[in-house]
Amino acid sequence: ILKLKLFHLEQGAIEVIKAAYAEIGNVAMVSSFGADSVVLLRLVAQVNRHAPVLFVDTEMLFAETLEYQARVASLLGLTNVQVIKAKDAELHDPSGTLHKSDPNACCSLRKTEPLQEALSSFDGWITGRKRHQSGTRARLNMFEAEDNSPRIKVNPLALWSAQDTQRFMQDTQLPRHPLVAKGYPSIGCAPCTTPVKE
């Protein structure tokens, strides 16, 4: 029964991705290449391995994330991974310590603003967001209008549980981010990410 459920989740996600490319127009996938990003990357690669994948390099990521990004892109045959970086990081954060005094400003400078600029030429974007991740996402739809933008957000994994994601990774033998084994359930920038003690 679990394999059948996972099969239906996979096929459903693939259909959502296909519909996004067919109906929305110019669509990019956004990926952090984090703890479980490889699941959605695999599904997108199955549909179109030449599709644009936006990867925001905040220049504060773990070396392991950069290595994992290159490894996964190669493994899945992704040919259009676009590395996005902040243009003004050195100007606004010359010492690289903004995260210590104002983490929100650092995220805005290094992640949010560069991503929004990169997305400005797209009609929609594919995310890995799931309903189980927070209360505000409990009613997450597969397709949703982005706030204050004409873009459409596409959430092919909205119905997937954490267990579904893990089982899919095991069944398909997808490589895990190396920091997961070191106690990092979620992986972002090195200064702001800590392992969870069991």
Residue ranges and their predicted role:
Residues 1-198:
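Nucleotide-activated chemistry modules centered on ATP-dependent adenylation/adenylyltransferase
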